[in-house]
């Protein structure tokens, strides 16, 4: 497969378009997804190709169109339900958690719910407390849901295609600050399997497990660590559920130190789960306690100066890793 560069947003759109051409059961529904092309312009042009029967604009009613999507999935369609801000998945909780996630189990496996909830996460866009939250830990907690967090354009396309083809409900969180980030994306068809982590950078002194936009942040920190004589291994889990526990454990056993970085809150969050996995599986190989880094325990501020302080940065990840290595 030949490669070219796409932005993260272009990769998402290409994945959806290719799957809609491949499978007539796929459709997309949400607010401002047709003529407006999505608030972040990631769907521009799709309605012109597929029409308003398959790119469906809805009123401002997340519970309503989420319910339409769940019902359509139960009856054989493959909907992509677009929730423009991750904060608004709070309005879809009954449809997502009580209906989509439960139907397969409650029907004894007779009902499949092949639905994708596509939404966002991430701060530093100056969108204030109600449009900047990272709530992926909430849904990672729910049996019956799969949760993907693409960290770049390649992952954005591959994970979306996997999600649309999956017979289970999938929630994809896209970091809205990454939509213009460019990266290599193969031209041919490809998918990325769920539950398979990727070692983004090999190292020997410390393992840094990072999700979503914290992957490039951690790779930047790894370069700073290299200058300080510390070799950092950076791992992208890609999915918080299913979680590739073995890759994380094996890396921590090799390096003897682990740092977990995520943009969600530390309290009862993704970092806590991953840290416990590493502590349980690699305890006798660790030379230091597993450290966690996440968002500050406050609503996301509107002030640019304060907002930037609430999430991990290359510098803070570098300092935390260096402290773990006692350098």
Give each language-model segment a name.
Residues 1-169, 173, 176-327:
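Thiamine diphosphate
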């Amino acid at each position: 497969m030949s490669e070219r560069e796409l932005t993260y947003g272009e990769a998402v759109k290409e994945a959806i378009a290719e799957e809609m051409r491949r499978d007539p059961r796929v459709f997309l529904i949400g607010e401002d997804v047709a003529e407006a092309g999505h608030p972040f312009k990631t769907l521009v042009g799709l309605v012109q190709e597929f029409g308003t029967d398959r790119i469906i604009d809805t009123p401002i009613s997340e519970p309503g169109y989420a319910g339409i999507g769940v019902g359509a999935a139960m009856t054989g369609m493959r909907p992509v339900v677009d929730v423009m801000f991750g904060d608004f998945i709070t309005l879809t909780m009954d449809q997502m958690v009580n209906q989509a996630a439960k139907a397969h189990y409650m029907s004894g496996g007779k009902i499949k719910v092949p639905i994708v909830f596509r939404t966002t996460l991430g701060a530093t866009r100056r969108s204030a407390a109600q449009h900047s939250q990272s709530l992926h830990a909430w849904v990672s907690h729910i049996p019956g849901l799969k949760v993907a967090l693409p960290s770049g354009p390649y992952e954005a396309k591959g994970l979306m295609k996997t999600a649309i083809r999956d017979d289970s409900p999938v929630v994809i969180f896209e970091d809205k600050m990454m939509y213009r980030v460019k990266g290599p994306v193969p031209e041919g068809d490809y998918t990325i399997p769920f539950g398979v982590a990727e070692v983004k950078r090999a190292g020997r002194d410390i393992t840094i497990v990072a999700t979503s936009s914290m992957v490039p942040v951690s790779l930047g920190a790894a370069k700073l660590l290299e200058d300080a004589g510390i070799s950092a291994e950076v791992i992208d889990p890609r999915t918080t559920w299913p979680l590739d526990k073995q890759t994380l454990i094996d890396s921590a056993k090799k390096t003897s130190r682990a740092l977990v970085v995520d943009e969600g809150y530390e309290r009862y969050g993704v970092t806590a789960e991953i840290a416990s996995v590493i502590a349980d599986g690699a305890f006798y190989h660790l030379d230091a306690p597993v450290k966690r880094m996440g968002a500050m325990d406050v609503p996301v501020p509107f002030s640019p100066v304060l907002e930037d302080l609430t999430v991990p940065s290359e510098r803070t990840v570098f300092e935390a890793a260096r402290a773990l290595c006692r350098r």
